[in-house]
A protein has these predicted regions:
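Short, intrinsically disordered, charge-balanced linker/junction segments flanking boundaries
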Residues: 189-193
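N-terminal beta-alpha lobe that positions the nucleotide/phosphoryl donor
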Residues: 1-185
Length: 193
């Protein structure tokens, strides 16, 4: 396994800095509830290192920092435009080939194919702030099927680090933007019936 992918079965709460609270909790549930007969859908996480690799491979870190550095922190008059431009930079990037290959290989291991749906869920991480909660600030996508839609959903999750509400939340709570990354959980969908 690379630094960019972690299986839920190998993730524990101590991994919050790498995979975020949501993915760490899923790893804990899979590890400790499965033996009690509680079924937890399997999955894997694209780590914060994978997020930064995507950002740096597309050479957009400085551009994003520049945009966030010009944010009007008093009235937030340019918040909407700042968020939009940051998201456009992320969505305009290209998935690094090796990262895409790793994601798709794990998707196949999970049983992913044209008819197998997964949830693609954001899980934010904050360096040196494992207690930080970003619940509800970032996007998740359900019933994703197929290679291209999966990679697009991962990119959309990465971009959701820069929604207006996520930027404002970090500003309101004193989190430095460059210290927050996004991990993405990819988990089997299960039918409710």
């Amino acid at each position: 396994m690379s630094a960019y992918i972690r299986l839920f079965k190998d993730i524990r709460i101590a991994d919050v800095p790498s995979v975020g609270g949501k993915n760490a909790s899923l790893g804990e549930m899979l590890a400790f509830l499965s033996s009690e007969g509680i079924r937890v859908p399997d999955g894997f996480a694209v780590t914060a290192a994978g997020f930064w690799y995507y950002i740096d491979s597309n050479n957009i870190r400085n551009a994003i920092s520049g945009l966030l550095g010009k944010l009007d922190r008093e009235k937030f008059s340019n918040l909407k435009e700042t968020g939009k431009r940051c998201r456009e930079l992320v969505l305009g990037g290209k998935m690094p080939e090796d990262l895409g290959v790793e994601i798709l290989a794990q998707y196949r291991e999970l049983g992913g194919g044209a008819s197998d749906a997964v949830a693609v869920r954001s899980s934010a991480t904050a360096e040196d702030l494992p207690e930080a909660s970003f619940a509800g600030q970032h996007e998740s996508y359900l019933n994703i099927q197929g290679d291209k839609p999966l990679l697009e959903a991962v990119q959309k999750c990465f971009a959701s680090l820069f929604t207006d509400r996520a930027i404002k939340y970090r500003e309101d709570n004193g989190f430095a933007h460059e210290k927050v990354a996004l991990s993405v959980g990819i988990q089997k969908m299960v039918r409710s019936d």
